[in-house]
Structures are given as C-alpha cells and as structure tokens.
Swiss-Prot record:
Keyword Phosphoprotein in annotation: yes
Protein task: Extremely potent competitive inhibitor of cAMP-dependent protein kinase activity, this protein interacts with the catalytic subunit of the enzyme after the cAMP-induced dissociation of its regulatory chains.
Name of the molecule in the record: cAMP-dependent protein kinase inhibitor beta
Organism: Rattus norvegicus
Pfam families: PKI (PF02827)
Residues bearing the modification Blocked amino end (Thr): 2
C-alpha cells in the first residue's frame, strides 16, 4: 500500500484535481519523441523530391550533346 500512497500524495500535490484534469502528466521529459521534427523532415524531403523532378523534366526536354561536338 505504500506505493499507492506515494502516488496519491504526488497526485494531490500536483494541483491536477477534478474529473477533467485527473490525467497523468504526459508532457514529461520521457515523452519527447521525434514527432515535432517529423513535419520538418517530411517538408525537406518533399522539397528535395520536387527539385529532383524539376531537374529530370529539364533533362528530358533538352537533347543531350555528344562529347565530340565541343571541339
């Protein structure tokens, strides 16, 4: 029972009383996942893919020069 008593006393002192606020603190230091960075990483990935697609479209529209024509 001592484990339960310590949880109850820490909850009572946390000022999270009431039916709506009776949730554990999910914003702890352990909850720092990679989800905030995910949007930025996906945005950077999308930009790189767009640039690659634009370069491929440019290359397809222009005929390639043979190396011997420069001379």
């Amino acid at each position: 029972m001592t484990d339960v008593e310590s949880v109850i006393s820490s909850f009572a002192s946390s000022a999270r009383a009431g039916r709506r606020n009776a949730l554990p603190d999910i914003q702890s230091s352990l909850a720092t996942g990679g989800s905030p960075d995910l949007a930025l990483k996906l945005e950077a990935l999308a930009v790189k893919e767009d640039a690659k697609m634009k370069n491929e479209e440019k290359d397809q529209g222009q005929p390639k020069k043979p190396l011997d024509e420069d001379k």
